[in-house]
Each structure stands twice: as C-alpha cells, then as structure tokens.
C-alpha cells in the first residue's frame, strides 16, 4: 500500500524568518554607550574652605612684631603662575564672598591674639585731675596752626607701685578725645571707656604698619580671578584666570577713604549691592591714586609708669617745643579731578542729576571723621573740605588749585572694630610722625527719604564696616573646589584583559591644571596626565612650604591664627587627595587616568550624542548637565566593580589562555617537559600492556613467539575455516602487517594502534549508547502513551462517576420534593375540608 504525501508551502515562513533576522541585525547594530571615568578633568564647584596666608619675608622688620603676624605665613612664590581660562564665563559676587568674611574674622583674631599678652589698664580707671596743657613758648609756629585749647590734658593720678599696698602719684598727658569729665568743674576726668570696656595697652614693640598679605587656597582648591576691567562686582565675567594666591592685600584699617589699595585699569568704577537701596554702601575704585601726606608735628616723649608688679603703662611725658595740630595735605587739583570722574559715573548710574557731596551726617568719631593709623598713632581727620561741593553736569567748584589741609585729632583709646566691650590703648610714639599714603578708593552713602529732590543726589562719606575695605580688594576673587573626577559616555566597555604594564603617553604640553577648562571635552589640549600630576605635586610642594614655615616659627604658632590655618590647609589638602584616590580604588581605577566601566549609559541622564558631548561641550558644561545624576552613577560604578571582583576567581582561570604567546613563556618550559615525560611514559606503559596481551594471546593459541615483533596469522573469516597441511588444499594468504624498526616508527605504530583501538571502542560505545537512548526513548514514549491513556481512562471514569452521582442526587431530590409536595397538598386539603367536615357533622347531628 502506497501512502501519498501532502506537499506543504513554507514560503511565508521563509519571509517571516528573513524579516525577523533583519530586525535583529538592525537592533544589534545600534551602538551601546558605557560610563567612562576620567581623572584630571578641569571641573570646579563653588566652595568655602580655610585659606592660609603668604607674605614676603623682607616686607617687615624682624625686630618688630607686627600685629598682622606675617612672620608665621609661608613665603610668597617668586614666580606666581596665573593661567588664563579661555572660553570660560564664570559668575562672581563680591557681596556674598566668603573670602571677605574669612579675612574679617582673621584680622579681628589677629588683633585679639596680638593684644592677649599685653597689659590691661584697669588700674588707670581712677579719677584723673587734669589741666589744659599750654605751649612752652609764646611764639607762633609758621608750619601749622596751634592745637586748640584743651586738646591735650595734663593729668595727675594715683597708681599702685611695685608694692601693692603703696600708692604713688604720677602724671601723664592725655588727648581730649580719650577722657571725659566727671564733675562740672572740668578738673576731674576719667578714661573714656572705663565704664563699658576693658582697655588693653598694645605691647611696646607691636607695629600697626600694614603688610601685604596674600590669601592662598589649599591644594585641591583654586582661586578664580576676574580680569574684566569694568567688572561691577557681581554677574558673569568672561575674562577669567586661575591663581593659587591673591595679590598682596594691605589690611588698612580706615574709614571714608580707602588707602594703599589697588586701582582700576580703565576709569573709575563704582560698585554697590543695590544702587536703588540708599542703605547700601557704594564702593568707589579710582583709576589714579591721590596722595595724602599726614604729619604730627609735635615732638613727643614717652615715659613708663609702673601700675603694679610687672606691669607698665606708657604715656606721653612731655612735648618738646610748641603744641601744634596734626594735619593731612591733599592736592586740591588732583582731588577735584578725581571727584569729576566719580561724578561722571554717578550721573551715568542715577541719571543726569546734580551730584552733591556733603560731610558725614553723624555718629561715632570713626565714621564722622576719616580715621586711619599713621606711624602707630590713630588719626581722626575732619574730611569736610573733601566732601563739600556741588556738581552739575561735571561742573564743580572753581577754586580747585592749592592744597587741601585736613585738621586731624589723635586718639589713643580706640574701639576695636566697633565691638562692644573691647578697647585698645595705643602707646604714644616718640618724636615727630610723618606718613604718606595713596587714596585708591572711597566709601559713599546716598541720602534717601521723601525730602530728597528728584533732581539732586546727595552723597556722604561712609565706612565703619571693615568688610567693605576687604571687599574692595577681594571683589575679583572667588574660591572653587576642584573636582578632578568626571564621568562621560563612550563606546568602550570594561573587559577583563591580561595584566600588563601600560605607559601613559598623553600630551606633554603644560597648560596648567585648569588651563584646558574652556576647551571641548574631546580636544587634544586636555592633558589629563599633567593635571593629575599637578594635584599631587601641588600638595607636596605646598606641604613642604607649610612645614618649613611651621618649623621656623613653631615657637610663635601658639600666638597666631595663621599657624592653625596652615595646619588646617595641610590636613584638608591630603584629605581631598585621599578621597579621590579612595573613589578610584573602589571603582577599580587606581593609577588610571581614563577608566572604562561595565555600567551602561542611561539616556535619561543625558540624551545628547557623542559628537554633541565631545566636540561641542566643555567639561564644566557637561558637569552641569549631569550634576543631578552624579551620585547615582558613582553608586552604579561601585556596584559593578563589586560584581566584577566576585567573578575575579573564575576569570583568573581564563586569564592564562588570553594569549597564545604565553605558551612560549620560558617559565612554562618545565611544565611542557613534564607533560612530554608523562606522554612518553604512558606510551611505554601501553606498549608493555599490548605486548603482554599479545604474548598471552599467542600462548593460548599454542604459539611460542621468538620476539616481540613476531607476527601470528590473522584469524580466517567464518566462511573460510582453517585447516592443516595434511588435509591438503590451497592455502590462503594470511593478513599480516610489516615489522617496524626504530623508536619513532615504533611510537607511531603504537599511537596508530592506540588511536584505532580507541576509535573502535568509542564507536562501539557510542552505538551502544545510541541504541540504549533509542530503546529508552521508545520505551519512554510507550510508557508516556500508556500513562496518557490510563490517565484519560480514569478521567473518563471520574467524569462518568460524577455524572452518575449528580443524576442520583437529582433523582433523590426530585423524589423528596414530590413527597413534600404531596404531604403539603394533603395538609392543605385537610384544612380545606374542615368546613365540609363540620357541616357534615352538623348534618349528622340534626339527623
């Protein structure tokens, strides 16, 4: 019987398979991006950190202890590097600059520490009996007018001597500003701050001469500098550079006028946090300085008064010659030219209004007058002549020639930084005093209120908050924290490769650490090697300078703020470097500048293409792009590295086969020799086994072999039985193999025999296994069919039983229901028949 097959059409399956294969190929062709770690990228973030100071060692007299304690600063760099950041725009804000606050706190702390070991003048808080000091002669001085009557008081008082229970009467000269009368008789006085402050006398060798201080950032941080010549103090700056230290800033403590500061490069610049708010101070930076020469013509002497055991009070003993008033001289022409430039800027800011300069509206002497330190004495000069003019369209007063002379008064008891409860007594300076300074800026305030005219703006000198003084110098700086670790997507994925030494050969051009900040991420100018090396070398160099300064001045560290800051900067720099290295170690990137990872790049972090990222964006722009996801990426890299370390044991086994060239390594030759000896020994053993088996076989057949190479006739087939010579007949040719000679031939013959033997046995084994598998498969299939039929049978039986059960239940329920209905009907009929039965009963009764 012939079975006719049915031909099926599989064309649609071929088409579907081809389409599916094409889709898979297209999907597999899409490039997958992976996270790559870069170390040494020019990225920074705004930060606040502890700055330390640097100062020129030759800038101060070693015999005098200046109040700024610059002897504890590190030496300035003879070749400071300033690296311009091209194509970089950075926001600056001089009004919210932590450097200003830090400098203010540092200067206050330096004054406090400088005055700690000095004498407290509490014993001088006694009644002073004073009279006005008169000139020694009646002649008039031609240099400058005499001091006002009563400006200097000759006071006598009682103090404790070196023996505590013994009092002694002393006398000294005090300025009128330093004493206040007790009674109305104008003969009893007391020191001005005795009721409110603890007066500390400055130590005899303390100098208040301002010395340039360079503020420096620790390693791992940098100071950005704005070089825009017309920068107004806040907003974006397009000309940015990076420095390690600021320029030398003189901590000049003055009000109204800024002295010995930096000048503007292109015209006068006015800066304010909010020009519309009259409560905000206006800081004016001049283009050309105006020289101010101050003099105290009095030839004073200084005397020492013992006020207790081991304590001395230094006071003015006498004035040699006439008593003349201190004063300052300013060129009237230069000052009016300066005001003219300032008026031009003010009118541009506030509209073409009339600008009026007036004297201070009142307050403490430090604010009402121009206060500053001159040669160790604190001058308070009346600045009314400087601020007493009206300007209409840059047209001011005509009497601009000549010299402007400012009368000055001197105070020895001054409030420190306008702090409550702290006052200082400056010991008098011997001889005459002369000092020359440069006015480089002004502090102005603008009048406000309803009474102010719409056509006039009134400006008055201000000051008092020393933060504005430091702000006038630090306006162009900001501190940033360098973030050398960067992540970006690339096509490279981390793979387990052989461990080998690798040489980093990136560009050798020195651009500085942040020199490539304005370049694109893929630019060749991104020299990661130089930048990474500078991180560590900068730390090492900085620590060497710090340690050198600390070692030289260790006996003074306990008296200065700078020593503590240097130690903080040292620890902070090392911590910053170790933190980055710890992250690299956790990620498996130690010692690498470019480190691939096995973390896939998520498009939700940034869906920009590689070309947009690497050719059009800087590292700073890229960092702002992914800033919200940086911590997540770091976590994923760490988890990926942990997973890789778990698999390291298995991968090490495969690592030996990573390259065939390792097979020829001389360290493996002994292993190869060992394997060769084992193979030869195995072959010899097999030869012996086969020889013994052949001998046993021959002996069983009745032969006596003469040698190991003696061959025996091969057995005939079953269709050709063997015979003997006596039986006659033609002998068949025996199947035999030729004898072999030589070791190699013998080895080859044995190997061939072994291979044939192994092949035949393996083939037989495979055939047997296939037969067994086939048999097991057939039996298994039959068993499955049997169990399937059995299962089907029992399912049918269960189904039938269930149907029968349901039928029986239904029948029983139906029968029970019929019985119940019948009983109910009978009961109903009984009730219905009750009246009939009653009627029948009555009928029977009547009958």
Swiss-Prot record:
Motif: YXXL motif; annotated at 703-706
Q: Where is this region: MPER?
A: 653-674
**Bridged cysteine pairs (disulfide):** 53-73, 118-203, 125-194, 130-155, 216-245, 226-237, 294-328, 374-435, 381-408, 589-595
Residue ranges for the region (V1) are 130-154
Intervals, Cytoplasmic compartment: 697-847
Residue positions the entry lists as glycosylated: 87, 135, 154, 186, 195, 232, 239, 260, 274, 293, 299, 329, 336, 352, 382, 388, 392, 398, 401, 438, 454, 602, 607, 616, 628
Key words of the record: AIDS, Apoptosis, Clathrin-mediated endocytosis of virus by host, Cleavage on pair of basic residues, Coiled coil, Disulfide bond, Fusion of virus membrane with host endosomal membrane, Fusion of virus membrane with host membrane, Glycoprotein, Host cell membrane, Host endosome, Host membrane, Host-virus interaction, Lipoprotein, Membrane, Palmitate, Signal, Transmembrane, Transmembrane helix, Viral attachment to host cell, Viral envelope protein, Viral immunoevasion, Viral penetration into host cytoplasm, Virion, Virus endocytosis by host, Virus entry into host cell
Q: From the UniProt record, which GO molecular function terms apply?
A: structural molecule activity
Per the record, the GO terms for biological process are: clathrin-dependent endocytosis of virus by host cell; fusion of virus membrane with host endosome membrane; fusion of virus membrane with host plasma membrane; positive regulation of plasma membrane raft polarization; positive regulation of receptor clustering; viral protein processing; virion attachment to host cell
**Signal peptide feature range:** 1-31
Residues with a covalently attached lipid (S-palmitoyl cysteine):
755
What ranges does the record give for the region V2, renumbered to this chain? 155-194
Region (V3) residue ranges read 294-327
Q: Which InterPro entries match?
A: Gp120_core_sf, Gp160, GP41-like, HIV1_Gp120
V4: where is this region? 381-408
Q: Where is this motif: Di-leucine internalization motif?
A: 846-847
Q: Where is this region: Immunosuppression?
A: 565-583
Q: Mark the transmembrane ranges.
A: 676-696
- Give the residues annotated as coiled coil: 624-658
Modification after translation, per record: Highly glycosylated by host. The high number of glycan on the protein is reffered to as 'glycan shield' because it contributes to hide protein sequence from adaptive immune system. Palmitoylation of the transmembrane protein and of Env polyprotein (prior to its proteolytic cleavage) is essential for their association with host cell membrane lipid rafts. Palmitoylation is therefore required for envelope trafficking to classical lipid rafts, but not for viral replication.
Where, in residue ranges, is this chain on the Extracellular side? 32-675
Extract the ranges annotated as region (CD4-binding loop). 360-370
Annotated Gene Ontology cellular components are: host cell endosome membrane; host cell plasma membrane; membrane; viral envelope; virion membrane
Domain remark in the UniProt entry:
Some of the most genetically diverse regions of the viral genome are present in Env. They are called variable regions 1 through 5 (V1 through V5). Coreceptor usage of gp120 is determined mainly by the primary structure of the third variable region (V3) in the outer domain of gp120. The sequence of V3 determines which coreceptor, CCR5 and/or CXCR4 (corresponding to R5/macrophage, X4/T cell and R5X4/T cell and macrophage tropism), is used to trigger the fusion potential of the Env complex, and hence which cells the virus can infect. Binding to CCR5 involves a region adjacent in addition to V3. The membrane proximal external region (MPER) present in gp41 is a tryptophan-rich region recognized by the antibodies 2F5, Z13, and 4E10. MPER seems to play a role in fusion.
Similarity comment: family membership: Belongs to the HIV-1 env protein family.
Stated name of the protein = Envelope glycoprotein gp160
What organism does the UniProt record list as the source? Human immunodeficiency virus type 1 group M subtype B (isolate SF162)
Q: What is the lineage of its organism?
A: Viruses, Riboviria, Pararnavirae, Artverviricota, Revtraviricetes
Underlying gene: env
